[in-house]
């Protein structure tokens, strides 16, 4: 962790808690690691991980494109300064408004099911998503390439769909795949690439092979990149990748304050952030590193619990911490992805502010919501 206690205390005093923090140096370092590993592959940031407009502008200035899964994300990419050639519209259930926006912007559309052939705007530029139907090393809610997944076409459906798209006058670039998120084993990617390349005998060469993202934070990027380039080479295709969590997770933290403790057979450390600010531990069973910003002689085992009136509002269970007291600051690591982007206004709790550490000061990226912001659209 590159942030000092003094800097964190300063952030809490200036912006309050809960508070999302990002480190500009680590954002740049993560992108550099991807660029180094994947070489000349085109990078499209999966903005669902963290769509803050300031981060998007940063990536756009670095030449990164954007993978979008909604009208709002397409418009965010446009607002960040990206042209349509750097946008991909993905998703299993696209709306008419999303098709229209993709056509206006000139974005590449990922065809996720056979009936999309007749729904596409005329002359669309497309990729066809193939589902390799395999089990991967991640939480079931994060696996998108299993046989039971709602995403993509079966390998058997791909040749006919490609032919229909060409007959309909669309520009077919190639194939798309994405097997999940936070995948631990590089072998999963090797197996998925192998299944996709089996299609070469049935569909011929391609202009593009998009292999998605989904790499865990400690993944062997060089090994995955080598296998991905080999798969693209089978088709004679340019390689595209879609990192999301890998680019932003380690560059972000959630700063929360202890509001009290409770001992009722279990020790509860009660903090001012919970499921409304940080849903991943509850939704995916995700484990995140905790950094107590206090010292104490005694260390005990604690459950870290949020303020929501839900039994499942637990950030962590059974973790060793120095004995906490009201007012102490607790830092939650690897929170830059699917943290702020999945925060909600459940219980009419305003969403947190977001700030960036530039190396010498804090830059406000998003102000803290007010209660009035929450009901402003209600009539």
Swiss-Prot record:
Group of enzyme by EC: lyase
Alphabetized UniProt keyword annotations: Amino-acid biosynthesis, Decarboxylase, Lyase, Lysine biosynthesis, Pyridoxal phosphate
GO molecular function: diaminopimelate decarboxylase activity; pyridoxal phosphate binding
A Pfam family recorded for this sequence: Orn_Arg_deC_N
Location of the active site: 309
Signal peptide from the UniProt entry: none
Cofactor(s) listed in the protein's UniProt record: pyridoxal 5'-phosphate
Subunit record text: Homodimer.
Recorded family membership: Belongs to the Orn/Lys/Arg decarboxylase class-II family. LysA subfamily.
Function text: Specifically catalyzes the decarboxylation of meso-diaminopimelate (meso-DAP) to L-lysine.
Protein's UniProt name: Diaminopimelate decarboxylase
């Amino acid at each position: 962790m590159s942030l000092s206690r003094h800097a964190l205390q300063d952030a809490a005093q200036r912006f309050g808690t809960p508070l999302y923090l990002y480190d500009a140096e680590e954002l740049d370092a993560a992108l550099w690691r991807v660029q180094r590993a994947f070489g000349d592959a085109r990078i499209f940031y999966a903005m669902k991980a963290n769509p803050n407009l300031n981060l998007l502008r940063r990536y756009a200035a670095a030449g990164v494109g954007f993978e979008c899964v909604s009208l709002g994300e397409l418009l965010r990419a446009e607002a960040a300064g990206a042209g349509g050639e750097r946008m991909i519209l993905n998703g299993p259930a696209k709306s008419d408004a999303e098709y229209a926006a993709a056509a206006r912007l000139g974005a590449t559309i990922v065809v996720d099911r056979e009936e999309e052939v007749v729904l596409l705007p005329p002359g669309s530029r497309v990729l066809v998503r193939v589902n390799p139907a395999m089990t991967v090393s991640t939480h079931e809610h994060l696996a998108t390439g299993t046989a039971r997944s709602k995403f993509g076409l079966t390998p058997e459906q791909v040749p006919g769909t490609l032919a229909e798209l060409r007959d309909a006058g669309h520009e077919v670039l190639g194939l798309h795949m994405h097997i999940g998120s936070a995948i631990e084993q590089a072998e999963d990617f090797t197996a998925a690439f192998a299944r996709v390349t089996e299609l070469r005998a049935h569909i011929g060469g391609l202009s593009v092979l998009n292999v998605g993202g989904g790499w865990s934070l400690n993944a062997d990027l060089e090994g995955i990149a080598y296998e991905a380039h080999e798969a693209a080479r089978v088709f004679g295709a340019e390689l595209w990748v879609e990192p999301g969590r890998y680019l932003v997770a380690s560059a972000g933290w959630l700063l929360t304050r202890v509001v009290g403790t409770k001992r009722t057979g279990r020790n509860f450390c009660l903090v001012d952030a919970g499921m409304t600010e940080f849903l991943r531990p509850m939704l995916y069973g995700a484990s995140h590193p905790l950094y107590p910003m206090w010292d104490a002689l005694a260390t005990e085992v604690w459950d870290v619990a949020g303020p929501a009136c839900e039994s499942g509002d637990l950030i962590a269970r059974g973790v060793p911490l120095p004995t906490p007291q009201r007012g102490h600051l607790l830092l939650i690591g690897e929170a830059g992805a699917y943290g702020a982007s999945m925060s909600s206004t459940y219980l009419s709790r305003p969403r947190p502010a977001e700030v960036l550490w530039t190396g010498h000061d804090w830059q406000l990226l998003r102000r803290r919501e007010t209660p009035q912001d929450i009901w402003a659209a209600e009539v």
